[in-house]
Amino acid sequence: MKQAYYGYPIPLEHKQGRRKLVLSFFADGLAQEVINGDDFEKLMPNTYKFFSKGTICTQAHSCSEWTYPSLATCVSGLDTLHHMMFHDKLDGELPKNSPTLIEYFKGKGYYTSKMDGEWRSIPSYGYARGLDQYVYQHQSMGARAEQEIMDVIEHLETFKETDQYLWMAVGDLHDVADGLDLSDAVQKNLTLEERELDELGVTSVKQNYSAKKTAMYKKTIQYFDMLFGFLYTYIENNYTDDEILISLFADHGQGYLIPTGKPFLSKERTKVAFMFRGANVKQQVTDEIISTADYLPIMCRLADIQYDAASIDGKLPKHLVVWKRESIQLQNLCIPKMYIVQLQMPGIMKFTLKILKRQMRKAGSYLEIIKYLDFIRMQKIHRLQMQSF
C-alpha cells in the first residue's frame, strides 16, 4: 500500500479585513548608513521610488550584529536574551510558547509561504511554523537574487486568487564579505584594484574596514535595486495600496563599512534598512529610534492583527501610535566575545551592563565587558564611543 501525503486546501478567495498581498522582504546585510539622505535615491532609485509612497525609517537599529540572532528577533519580537538563539556552534529553536510573525498571519487566514536560501532561518530553527508552503534552496544553489526575484513574481501570480503572506529573502550581499564571485553586471563596474580580496576566511562579523569591499558592496546594492525594480513594477501593476502591505527590512550592517578606530557597535553595523508601504501606512520619513524587535508588532498592527504585546520585547513606534520607545538593546553575542548594552533614551543616555550568566553556562566561554561612553542625544544618536575595561 502506497503512502499518500495531503496538504491543507488552499481557499481561493479574498476576505474583508485581510490584504491581498503581505510581503516581508528580507534583505540580508543592507545597512541603512549607506542609503541615508540623497544616497538612497542614488544607489537604489527603484526602491526609493516605491517606498517613498510609504514610511521609511532612518533610525532602525538591529538587536544583534549577525543574522542568526537578529533574524530570530525580527520574526519573534523577542530580544536575544529571551529567544536565546545566539551561539554560532549550538543550534537553537524559536521559543514554542511565543507565536511567530508567520503564525499570526496564518491565524488570520492568510495563505503563508516562505522562499529563501538563508541557512540561518531553516525549518529546524522553527521557521516552518505557520507555513503552508516552504521553498528552500541554499543561496548559492538556486536562490540568488536574480533567481529569487523571478521565482517570487511567479509565486505571486500563481496564488493571486488568495490572500497571501510571503516571506522572501535575498542574501547575496554576504558574497562581498565571503569573497565569492559577484555578478558580471557588478564586476564590470569595479576597477581591478577594487576587485582585489582581503581578509579571506574571516567571518563577516569580525571584518575590519575595507575601501575595496565598500565599493563592491555599493555596486552590489545598485545591481540589487535593478532586480528589485521588476518586483516593484509587478506589485504596482497588479495591486492598489489599499490591497497590500509591503516591507523591506534588514538584520545588520557590515563591519567593513566602519572606519578604523570607531567602536564595534557603530552605526554602519547597527543601523538597518526598515521601510513599509501599503494600507494603513503613512507617507513619511521618520528618524524615530526603532528596534528590529519592533518588526513583529509593526506588521501585525498594519495588518489589523491582534498579537500578545505583553509577552514580547517589540513595541509599536510613535509614528504608528502614541508610544515612545524607552530603550534599545544592542547586543554582540559572537562567541567568545559577549556583551550587552542597553541605551536609555530619555535625556543624556545612560547605560546598563548585564552579565549573561545563562549564556556563559551554555557556551562555556568567557565574558568581555565593553564600556560605552559619550552617549549624546539630540533626538537621535550622533556618536557613540567605546572603551574596554
Describe the residue ranges of each PLM region.
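Catalytic domains that recognize anionic headgroups
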Residues: M1-F389
